């Protein structure tokens, strides 16, 4: 994996980790204003639990993927392609839903967190409630990162893990600058740009899901499983329709600059009709919902810079 192919992982982990970091920062700021900083240990417990849960899920998925790789028998490639398609579809659904949900919730997010923390500090044993708020924020974003890595089939790739850690580290530094040093960052613009990039990256996952599904069906047809009828489209593809273009001689998607377009915009040097249709539908539907949410939500998530 080179720099270009690591960009989507960096972008996704940066965005998701910053969302979680902002929640943590808001919680700590609320505790500081309420003069309840003795409860901050529960914040760190929530962070730790969320990180551990995310890592465990990542290890589980990595183990499943490696187990499939080691399975003996002629049907292992079919199972691998089906699993890749399934994980990709789940990642597309979850990332799309969270993108739209965060866009909708951004305006009221700080107020909701403040309300939860204020209620928690007024109750005996409120530290556990604080830890749960932080845990949910961390584990939600952690699961998204893990699913994206799994969909990219990079769970055990050191370079991919490095890109993910770089994104997380950058997010933590940004949160530190905001909450500890009071640096003013335009979070509204940041999340708009990162959200648009995420939308395009997830659109590329849609193309990959269809490719893996087509590969699985093609291999089923060749494996004498009596499923040859699934290849209902003539040509070198079972499900994807006719080939729209073959730009491999001029702009291969495994070399610069094609690999940058592939990783950031879903470009493929071989593109089929149904892939193009699915990509267009995804960007039209999810993109319209996303930009409509941006137009109607007003302010983006705002962080309160509070030294604690």
UniProtKB/Swiss-Prot annotation:
Keywords for the protein's UniProt record, in alphabetical order: Cell membrane, Membrane, Transmembrane, Transmembrane helix
Example GO biological process: iron ion transmembrane transport
Keyword Transmembrane among UniProt keywords: yes
InterPro entries: EfeU/FTR1-like, FTR1/Fip1/EfeU
Lipid bilayer topology: Multi-pass membrane protein
Transmembrane segments: 46-66, 82-102, 159-179, 190-210, 271-291
GO cellular component, one term: plasma membrane
Subcellular location: Cell membrane
Single GO MF annotation: ferrous iron transmembrane transporter activity
Family per record: Belongs to the oxidase-dependent Fe transporter (OFeT) (TC 9.A.10.1) family.
PANTHER family given in the database record: IRON TRANSPORTER FTH1, PLASMA MEMBRANE IRON PERMEASE
Name of the molecule in the record: Uncharacterized protein slr0964
Organism of derivation: Synechocystis sp. (strain ATCC 27184 / PCC 6803 / Kazusa)
Record lineage: Bacteria, Bacillati, Cyanobacteriota, Cyanophyceae, Synechococcales
């Amino acid at each position: 994996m080179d720099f270009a192919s690591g960009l989507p992982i960096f972008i996704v982990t940066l965005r998701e980790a910053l969302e979680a970091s902002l929640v943590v920062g808001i919680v700590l700021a609320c505790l500081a204003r309420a003069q309840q900083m003795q409860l901050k240990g529960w914040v760190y417990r929530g962070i730790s639990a969320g990180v551990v849960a995310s890592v465990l899920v990542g290890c589980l998925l990595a183990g499943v993927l490696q187990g499939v790789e080691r399975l003996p028998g002629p049907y292992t490639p079919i199972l691998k392609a089906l699993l890749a398609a399934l994980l990709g579809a789940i990642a597309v659904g979850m990332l799309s839903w969270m993108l739209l949900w965060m866009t909708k919730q951004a305006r009221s997010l700080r107020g909701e967190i403040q309300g939860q923390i204020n209620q928690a500090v007024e109750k005996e044993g409120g530290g556990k409630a604080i830890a749960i708020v932080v845990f949910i924020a961390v584990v939600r974003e952690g699961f998204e990162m893990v699913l994206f890595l799994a969909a990219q089939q990079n769970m055990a790739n050191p370079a991919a893990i490095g890109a993910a850690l770089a994104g997380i580290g950058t997010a933590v530094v940004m949160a530190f600058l905001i909450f500890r040093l009071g640096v003013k960052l335009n979070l509204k613009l940041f999340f708009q740009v990162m959200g648009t990039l995420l939308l395009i990256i997830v659109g590329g996952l849609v193309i990959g899901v269809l490719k893996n599904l087509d590969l699985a069906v093609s291999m089923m047809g060749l494996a004498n499983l009596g499923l040859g009828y699934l290849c209902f489209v003539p040509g070198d593809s079972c499900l994807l329709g006719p080939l729209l273009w073959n730009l491999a001689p001029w702009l291969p998607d495994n070399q610069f600059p094609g690999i940058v377009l592939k990783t950031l915009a879903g470009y493929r040097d071989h593109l089929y009709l149904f892939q193009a249709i699915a990509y267009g539908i995804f960007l039209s539907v999810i993109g319209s919902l996303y930009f409509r949410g941006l137009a109607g939500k007003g302010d983006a998530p705002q962080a309160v810079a509070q030294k604690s």
